[in-house]
Amino acid sequence: MPIGVPKVLFGSPGEEDAAWVDIYNRLHRERLLFLGQELDSEISNQLVGLMVYLSIEDKTRDFFLFINSPGGWVIPGIGLYDTMQFVPPDVHTICMGLAASMGSFILVGGEITKRLAFPHARVMIHQPASSFYEAQAGEFVLEAEELLKLRETLTRVYVQRTGKPLWVVSEDMERDVFLSATEAQAHGIVDLVGDENMGDLV
């Protein structure tokens, strides 16, 4: 039997009475954000809105973005990535479970030195996919050109943020490359592999 989203007591500073709020609302107020599903326009817009609003509220407190995502749409992912670079607070990215495809792109977009993977997390990178089989000939050519531009954009970001040569990143993106947490660290996608002391970071 579903129980819905758990609620917790929360009182803002200066308020006498605490109120029951859903747990995600409470966590968001502590700058703890979650990408726990396929990335689409809706979840991207929610995370962008939270980052912008909370940045206006306080420009000094870092964000912690927990990622467990199979990937998703490229354009909403790029929008979220750009927002992470735009907002004044640093964005810590934390991979738990799986960060695949656009999930790994968001993971690598965290503040350099503040990207972390849990010990048993998995990371997967590959080139952007398309629905060519649904397109007419003219649409196919236009979509292929756009896809090539998107691939170049993603590749440049991975090169810039991992410190790996262009040829290494390009080769990795030719196919699905699955990495353990330590392999992701060696690839420069994350900076740290979490241990029992990582709770001190949040």
Curated annotation (Swiss-Prot):
<dbReference type="InterPro" id="IPR029045">
    <property type="entry name" value="ClpP/crotonase-like_dom_sf"/>
</dbReference>
<comment type="similarity">
    <text>Belongs to the peptidase S14 family.</text>
</comment>
<keyword id="KW-0645">Protease</keyword>
<dbReference type="GO" id="GO:0051117">
    <property type="term" value="F:ATPase binding"/>
</dbReference>
<dbReference type="GO" id="GO:0006515">
    <property type="term" value="P:protein quality control for misfolded or incompletely synthesized proteins"/>
</dbReference>
<dbReference type="GO" id="GO:0004176">
    <property type="term" value="F:ATP-dependent peptidase activity"/>
</dbReference>
<protein>
    <recommendedName>
        <fullName>ATP-dependent Clp protease proteolytic subunit</fullName>
        <ecNumber>3.4.21.92</ecNumber>
    </recommendedName>
</protein>
<keyword id="KW-0378">Hydrolase</keyword>
<dbReference type="GO" id="GO:0004252">
    <property type="term" value="F:serine-type endopeptidase activity"/>
</dbReference>
<comment type="function">
    <text>Cleaves peptides in various proteins in a process that requires ATP hydrolysis. Has a chymotrypsin-like activity. Plays a major role in the degradation of misfolded proteins.</text>
</comment>
<keyword id="KW-0720">Serine protease</keyword>
<dbReference type="InterPro" id="IPR018215">
    <property type="entry name" value="ClpP_Ser_AS"/>
</dbReference>
<comment type="subunit">
    <text>Component of the chloroplastic Clp protease core complex.</text>
</comment>
<dbReference type="InterPro" id="IPR001907">
    <property type="entry name" value="ClpP"/>
</dbReference>
<dbReference type="Pfam" id="PF00574">
    <property type="entry name" value="CLP_protease"/>
</dbReference>
<dbReference type="GO" id="GO:0009570">
    <property type="term" value="C:chloroplast stroma"/>
</dbReference>
<dbReference type="InterPro" id="IPR033135">
    <property type="entry name" value="ClpP_His_AS"/>
</dbReference>
<keyword id="KW-0934">Plastid</keyword>
<dbReference type="InterPro" id="IPR023562">
    <property type="entry name" value="ClpP/TepA"/>
</dbReference>
<dbReference type="GO" id="GO:0009368">
    <property type="term" value="C:endopeptidase Clp complex"/>
</dbReference>
<feature type="active site">
    <location>
        <position position="126"/>
    </location>
</feature>
<feature type="active site" description="Nucleophile">
    <location>
        <position position="101"/>
    </location>
</feature>
<keyword id="KW-0150">Chloroplast</keyword>
